[in-house]
Amino acid sequence: LPSDITGYSVYNSATGETVEISDAIPYPTWDEDQDIPMMRQPYGVAGWLDGDKALLVYDRYDIWSVDPAGKTKPVCLTAGEGRKTNRRFRYIKTDSEEISITPGREMLLSVFDYTDKRNGYATMTAGKATAPDIKVLDTYTFSQLRKAKNANVYAYQRANFNTSPDVWIAQNNNFRNAAKVTDAN
């Protein structure tokens, strides 16, 4: 089985060149815990920045900006915070019509803490290398997130082994003070 595919490459149809774009990321971009006899699966891609200026890829913990031409070094957009805190950050696409990610805009992230298994949400600025701003990190599972089209309002489910899945509403990324709008049992 092939075992040498360990990153991302870009094919330039105008020149016929293939460029390995993730080799300079100092950490694996594939699931290093995978122990079944098949090609290793990548952690995934968050998306492209506007104008195909960069591809955002994941390692086990963090989000990296990679130059599709391979001319500049990859930048860890989460500033290594995931690896430092043993947390996984992943981009949540909240606009179904989004084609690319606009640099400078706020990105909503899911957070998973490998140490204590807490989940939550964080935000970061697209294209800027800074530690994500944790909005909520708790012992619940957060799912079914939906964003209002023209407002900074989110609806989502929150549940754990002791509480049924209820719908909560958060305004202006204030997930810590979200309002519970259902009462499931």
Where in this protein do the model-derived segments appear?
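Short loop/turn segments immediately following the C-termini of beta-strands
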Residues: 3-5, 60, 68, 111-114, ...
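Short loop/turn segments immediately following beta-strands, especially the blade-tip
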Residues: 13-18, 67-75, 126-128, 171-175
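Non-catalytic accessory segments flanking enzyme active sites
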Residues: 86-185
